Amino acid sequence: MCVGRLIFTYEIELGILCKLERCVTTIKDVYKREGLPIYYRKAGGRYYKIITKIPTHSSAEGELKVREKYQSLVGAALSSNLFYWFWLIHSDWHNLRSSELEMFPIPFESFSDEELDKINTLYDTYLNDLYSKSQTTKTGLKCFFARQSKMHIDAIDKFIGEKYGLSEIEIKFLINYDYQYRNAE
């Protein structure tokens, strides 16, 4: 199925995209020059996008600054299976560009303070697990193995998916998207 320049393998993908397009706010809307940082790997990464609050000091690392209130929400959303799928349909499959981050929709105002606390807990749990399973190279760079923390990524999707109006079937589709590649050793 083809919509514009986007090609979908499954009909469910069009429904997910339509729900994302209903969201009128994007990450760009919460950029703040003096905000809190979110770090991301600009190149490589294959089947996972590693998004953290702490820099790795890699030459392939990018940074964006967002309003303090939304740092964990942005980090969690960009770590989600939903963002991975969104990135695949909008990218060259190799690089993570700031324009792809900026255009990702997040329904910021639909999250209550309690829900922001919950997403902060989910994201911190994921990051703690991610770091506990990471390795440091001889040159001092962190190597992450996100597939070992996938259950925490899935928990993020289950929580934020409802805010996009995604059905349980759509959330399961995203959680299992590219599963055979994303979980291979």
Question: Could you tell me what each predicted segment is?
Answer:
Residues 22-185:
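S-adenosyl-L-methionine
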